[in-house]
Amino acid sequence: MMEQPSTNLTADVLIDEEAEPDLSIWFGCLETARTELAQAAIAAAAVEGCDRGSVGVRICDDATIHPINREFLQHDYPTDVISFPYELEPPMVEGELVASFETAIENASEPSNPLSPREELLLYVVHGTLHIVGHDDQSPEPRAAMRRAEIAAMKLIGIELPLSNDEDSAPEQDDSFDDDASDSSGGIMSGGVS
């Protein structure tokens, strides 16, 4: 891990019980997992000049993220990460995200993916945090800007992402990366949705 920038931004990490065995293996122990996941959120916010406020990070399984995806984004399938931005007035940011460790395992197993499940999950936290701080990936130009921010944030935490063929553009959109759920009322850190 590289040294993190000075910040008054906190990142609280909740790891669901189902994720604990895998994360203990990937990160060495749960405390290291919490620390690295928090650092990923803080790094992503810092890339966009947000260094005050809080980001909640919840790591869950596909069975947990599926109904959240259905309720807030009307997508009836599990996904990798969903963001809930609550307030953004840089340098202040408030939001939460939920990410699936099982989707990280599945996506990291793809032959074309050079990332380990640990790195894939850290990328989900970075990606979700970038949605919280205002990034969009629904069209090519914003998607390319988001990809550059992902590369910068991952580098801050010591992970080099592979560049696309054209360094200034993002790879084809990965449909597993979801929009933010900005119309939501939140509550993902408490372990459920209404």
UniProtKB/Swiss-Prot annotation:
Compartments in which it is found: Cytoplasm
Keywords: Cytoplasm, Endonuclease, Hydrolase, Metal-binding, Nuclease, Ribosome biogenesis, rRNA processing, Zinc
Spans annotated as Disordered: 162-194
Cofactor: Zn(2+)
PROSITE patterns tied to this protein: UPF0054
GO biological process, one term: rRNA processing
Protein name: Endoribonuclease YbeY
